[in-house]
């Protein structure tokens, strides 16, 4: 697999065995929305898998990227990719947490940690997309005007409205949906989860 955005564009990275890779078109679409220059911003990659999205964020100069991956083998591959790319040489911070994504959301809320971009791509068969979205709404770890980016299976549905989050994009890419929200602190919040997005 190759990185397609930013400083590391064209660089290869390791893929864990059995992981479903995030399509190039989808990765490009995400960064076309959130921007190709993430200087000074923090990025959280939940259910990180190969860590492809977090690596793209580092390539786009995100100041800090946190990868959360429960599977030890996958987490080790992400660590190997960070050794390969050496983001610290560009003054960027990257950390891999080998733990559960839902527990991590609660932990960050207790610690007062906040992120500018949160990406999540849980295993499709478990239908965890909406549960993850609700956890992010309940345990607010997002900065004002932050983005939430969700990739999930076609069998799931996501809300049109989610608290103070505005829907920016909803599109099918192969066997997955991509839904992007932006937080808007000035907007009166509608019901936490309203409407659905899907087929």
Spell out what each predicted region is.
Residues 1-199:
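Class I S-adenosyl-L-methionine-dependent methyltransferase catalytic core
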């Amino acid at each position: 697999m190759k990185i397609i955005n930013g400083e590391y564009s064209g660089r290869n990275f390791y893929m864990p065995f059995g992981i479903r890779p995030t399509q190039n078109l989808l990765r490009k679409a995400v960064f076309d929305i959130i921007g190709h220059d993430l200087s000074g911003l923090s990025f959280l990659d939940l259910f990180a898998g190969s860590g492809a999205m977090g690596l793209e964020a580092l390539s786009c100069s995100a100041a800090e990227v946190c990868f959360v991956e429960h599977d030890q083998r996958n987490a080790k591959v992400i660590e190997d990719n960070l050794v390969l790319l050496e983001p610290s040489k560009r003054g960027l911070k990257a950390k891999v947490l080998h733990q559960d994504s839902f527990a991590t959301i609660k932990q960050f809320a207790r610690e007062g940690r906040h992120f500018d971009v949160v990406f999540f791509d849980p295993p499709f068969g478990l239908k965890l997309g909406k549960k993850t979205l609700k956890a992010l709404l309940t345990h607010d770890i997002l900065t004002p005007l932050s983005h939430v980016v969700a990739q999930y299976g076609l069998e799931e549905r996501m809300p049109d409205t989610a608290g103070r989050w505005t829907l920016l994009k909803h599109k099918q890419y192969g066997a997955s949906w991509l839904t992007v929200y932006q937080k808007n602190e000035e907007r009166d919040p509608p019901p936490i989860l309203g409407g659905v997005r899907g087929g």
